[in-house]
Amino acid sequence: STKAYSTQLAVIYMIVLYMAEQLHNISEQELQAYIEELQRLPEFVAACLTDKETIQYFASKYFNAKDMYFIGRNVDYAASLEASLKLKEISYIHSEAYTAGELKHGPISLIEDGTLVIAICTYDKLFDKMMSNVKEVKARGAVVLGITTQQKKEAVSQEADYSFCVPKISDFMLPSLSIIPLQLFA
């Protein structure tokens, strides 16, 4: 369920922060900033829901799709896995999640004209590589929905057919937000 997934992520974040503190891998100031961000997650989730019409439009347009693929890198790949599972469970649509860096090793051959690909592009460090993957699937005829942060919206909008923005928070916490529009979509 959505609540279980979100709760699991929050607990993982707390464990990671605790371990980082215990191992002295994080300053007190950084720790407090992460804790404040974690406490504000409900506010950030609410911000994701203000533009749910975009996702509802996309869902209504492609509700009878036969196949759908989710791609992402690093933490975005983890969100892709959860989104694919949700789509299968709720909509009974065949979907798969792939790490975008592995597309050339087989999965790209599944993409044909009109195939739906949801690209989660929130992780800053691998953003340029992710955009390269979006171009690859577009070249094969995919229809792409890009999930990104407001800071990257323009770049994603230039490549994807549709885009949806989530608030920018720490990279490792972004799956808590990028999953929201995808759960609405499912």
What are these regions, as identified by a protein language model?
Residues 1-186:
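A SIS-like phosphosugar-recognition module
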